[in-house]
From Swiss-Prot:
UniProt key word Transmembrane helix: yes
Protein name, UniProt field: Cytochrome P450 monooxygenase notG'
GO cellular component: membrane
Application in biotechnology: Notoamides have been shown to exhibit antitumoral activities. Notoamides A-C show moderate cytotoxicity against HeLa and L1210 cells with IC(50) values in the range of 22-52 mg/ml, but the IC(50) value of notoamide D is greater than 100 mg/ml. Moreover, notoamide C induces G2/M-cell cycle arrest at a concentration of 6.3 mg/ml.
InterPro entries: Cyt_P450, Cyt_P450_E_grp-I, Cyt_P450_sf, Cytochrome_P450_monoxygenase
Signal sequence interval, chain numbering: 1-22
Sugar-modified residues: 226, 404
Location within or outside the cell: Membrane
Pathway(s) of this molecule: Alkaloid biosynthesis
Lineage, opening ranks: Eukaryota, Fungi, Dikarya, Ascomycota, Pezizomycotina
Length: 544
C-alpha cells in the first residue's frame, strides 16, 4: 500500500511543521540540559515505533518502512533546526548585540575557539574587537563594564545561577545550589566554620604542612624548582586535612595522590566551557565517568572515616557535621556532606595554589617590592621556624596591596561565572539586557580595563592603600566574587596566602632561572573555571 503523492507531501509538511512547533513551544522555553540521553531514547522510540506500525499496516519490509520513517525524522529535524537557526540569527532577544556570527548559531562556537588558548585570553580578544558587551553564544553575553559586576553578582542582584551549576547533578554542594533560599540556608551552616575562632584552629592545623613545604623548598635551594607543583602539593594536603581530618600526603610523596590526579584529569573538560547539555553527555557516559566514580567512592570512604574521628582541633567538616548532633546522616544528607567535602578540597586547593604561584611570579618580577615587604615584616616577631601569626600581619598595607594587585591581574577564577538575568532583564550603562539570558563579567578582562583602573597593566600595590585615585571602580575588583554567592573561604585563603608569603620572602631570595625574565611564563596558563598554572620555575636561595 502506498499513499498518494499529495497525501505523502502533506504528511512530510505536517512532520516539518511539528519540528517547528516543538522548537517554538518546547525547546525554546525552559531548561532541557539535565537528561540529554533521555531525549535520545525518546527520539529512538518515536522513530522505531512508527517503523513497525508502517511495516505492519502498509505491508512493507522493515527496511522500506525504515526508509519512510527515516525521511519523516529528517524532515522533523529539518523543521526543528531551521526554526532554531532562524530564531537565533534573526529573531533572538540578543539579535542586536555585537559578537562573532558563529556565536549566534551555537554555544559550541566559543568551545571551538578555546582549543588553542584559555577562555580569559579569548574573551580579552573579543572585547578588544567588539566592545564592552559581546555575544559569545546564542543566549550568552560577556560584559566587561565595571559597573556590571555589582548588577550581575551583588547582594541586590536578582540574577541567579545558570545551568552550568548543574554539571555535577545529582550531587549537591554549597557551590551548586541554584535556589537562593536553599543556598542561603546551607551557607549559614558553612559560616560557623569560618569565624575567627575556627580560623585560629585552622592556622594551627596548617602549620604542620607549611613546615613540610619549607623543608622541601630548603632541600631545593640553588636549584630550579617548579614552585607551582609544590604549592599544589601543599594546598591539597592542607585542604584534605581541613575536609577529612587527614592530608593526601602529597608533600611526603612529592607527587599527586591518585584521587587528586583523577580530579585534575576530569576538570580538563571545563577548559572548553561546553554547553551544559553536552557536558552532561560526557559525564553520564560510563566509559568516561569510570574514574569519576572511583573518586566518589574514595571520597565516600574518607568521609566515613572522618565522621568516626574525634579531632582535638576542629576542621571545616566539623561545622558541616554539627547539625547532625551525633546521629547518622540520611542518604540525602550524606550526599550533601560528600559534595561539600569535595568542594572544600577542589575550591580551596586549586585557587589557593594558583594565587600563591601568581604572587611568587610577581615577587620575582618586582624585587623592589620584596624589600618593602621585608621592611614591613621586620619589626614583627616570628617564631623559631620563621612563622608569623596571622593576626600580626593581616593589616600590613603593602602586603595586602601586593596580594590585591596580584589577584587583580591574575584572578584565580578569571573568566566565566555565569548568571541568568531575571524575567524583567537588567540595565547596564543604559543598555537593556533581556531576561533569561546567561551573562558573566570576566575578572581578567575587567581587572586589566582602563574603565576600572588607571594604568591597568602596571603593577602598583600602592593603588590599594596610598593612591586610591588609581582605582576607578573598587566594586569591580572581585577575585573572590561578591554578593550572596561570594567565596565563603576567602578569610581562610587570605590567611594562608599572607602567612605563606611572609615566611617565604623572609626565608629566601626569589628569582627566575638564568635567561628567563618571566615575560612568557604566564602565556601557558589554563582556564578551567579556575586558573591553572602548570609551570612556574624559580630559583630560591637562603637569605644570609
Amino acid at each position: 500500500m502506498e499513499l498518494p503523492f499529495s497525501a505523502m507531501s502533506l504528511l512530510y509538511l505536517l512532520v516539518g511543521i511539528a519540528g517547528v512547533i516543538s522548537h517554538q513551544c518546547y525547546f525554546r522555553r525552559g531548561e532541557h540540559h539535565l537528561y540529554p540521553f533521555a531525549y535520545l531514547r525518546w527520539y529512538t522510540l518515536i522513530i522505531t515505533a512508527p517503523t513497525v506500525v508502517v511495516s505492519i499496516v502498509w505491508g512493507l519490509p522493515l527496511y522500506d518502512a525504515a526508509k519512510a520513517t527515516g525521511g519523516w525524522a529528517l524532515t522533523y529535524f529539518a523543521g526543528l533546526y531551521t526554526s532554531l537557526l532562524l530564531y537565533r540569527v534573526q529573531f533572538h532577544p540578543l539579535h542586536g548585540f555585537p559578537g562573532p556570527y558563529g556565536a549566534r548559531i551555537s554555544g559550541l562556537w566559543l568551545s571551538m575557539g578555546l582549543r588553542d588558548r584559555p577562555a580569559f585570553q579569548k574573551l580579552q580578544e573579543l572585547h578588544n574587537q567588539y566592545g564592552p558587551i559581546v555575544r559569545v553564544g546564542p543566549s550568552e553575553l560577556s560584559i566587561a563594564y565595571p559597573e556590571a559586576v555589582g548588577i550581575v553578582y551583588g547582594h541586590q542582584s536578582r540574577c541567579y545561577k545558570s545551568t552550568f551549576y548543574d554539571n555535577g547533578h545529582p550531587m549537591k554542594s554549597l557551590h551548586s545550589y541554584r535556589d537562593r533560599a536553599a543556598h542561603d540556608q546551607r551557607r549559614r551552616t558553612w559560616s560557623t566554620g569560618f569565624g575567627d575562632r575556627a580560623l585560629r584552629g585552622y592556622e594551627t592545623r596548617v602549620h604542620e604542612y607549611r613546615q613540610k613545604l619549607f623543608t622541601r623548598l630548603n632541600d631545593a635551594v640553588g636549584l630550579t624548582v617548579n614552585i607551582s607543583d609544590w604549592f599544589n602539593f601543599y594546598s591539597y594536603d592542607v585542604m584534605g586535612d581541613l575536609a577529612f581530618g587527614r592530608s593526601f600526603n602529597m608533600l611526603d610523596t612529592h607527587s599527586n595522590h591518585w584521587a587528586i590526579q583523577v580530579l585534575l584529569d576530569g576538570i580538563v573538560l571545563y577548559k572548553y566551557f561546553v554547553p551544559s547539555w553536552l557536558f552532561r553527555c560526557f559525564v553520564t557516559l560510563p566509559s568516561l565517568s569510570k574514574n569519576w566514580h572511583r573518586f566518589v567512592e574514595f571520597t565516600t570512604q574518607k568521609l566515613v572515616h572522618r565522621m568516626n574521628d574525634k579531632l582535638e582541633i576542629p576542621d571545616i567538616c566539623a561545622s558541616l557535621l554539627a547539625p547532625l548532633n551525633g546521629r547518622s546522616p540520611t542518604p540525602d544528607e550524606f550526599n550533601l556532606l560528600m559534595g561539600d567535602a569535595m568542594l572544600v578540597v577542589t575550591a580551596g586547593s586549586d585557587t589557593t595554589a594558583t594565587a600563591l604561584t601568581s604572587v611568587v611570579y610577581e615577587l620575582a618580577r618586582h624585587p623592589e617590592d620584596v624589600e618593602r615587604l621585608r621592611a614591613e615584616l621586620l619589626p614583627i616577631d616570628a617564631d623559631a621556624n620563621g612563622e608569623y601569626r596571622h593576626e600580626q600581619i593581616s593589616n600590613l598595607p603593602h602586603l595586602n596591596g601586593f596580594i590585591n594587585e596580584t589577584l587583580r591581574l591574575h584572578p584565580p577564577v578569571p573568566s566565566v561565572i555565569p548568571r541568568i538575568t531575571p524575567a524583567e532583564g537588567v540595565h547596564v550603562k543604559g543598555t537593556h539586557i533581556p531576561g533569561g539570558m546567561a551573562v558573566f563579567c570576566p575578572q581578567w578582562v575587567i581587572g586589566r580595563s582602563d574603565a576600572a583602573f588607571i594604568a591597568p597593566l602596571s603593577f602598583n600595590p600602592e593603588r590599594w592603600y596610598k593612591h586610591p585615585d588609581l582605582i576607578k571602580h573598587r566594586s569591580a575588583y572581585a577575585p573572590f566574587l561578591t554578593g550572596p554567592y561570594s567565596c565563603i573561604g576567602k578569610p581562610l585563603a587570605l590567611m594562608n596566602i599572607r602567612t605563606t608569603i611572609a615566611r617565604l620572602i623572609m626565608t629566601f631570595e626569589i628569582r627566575f632561572p638564568a635567561g628567563e625574565d618571566g615575560s612568557h611564563l604566564m602565556e601557558n596558563v589554563e582556564d578551567h573555571f579556575s586558573m591553572g598554572i602548570e609551570r612556574m620555575p624559580v630559583v630560591l636561595t637562603r637569605r644570609g
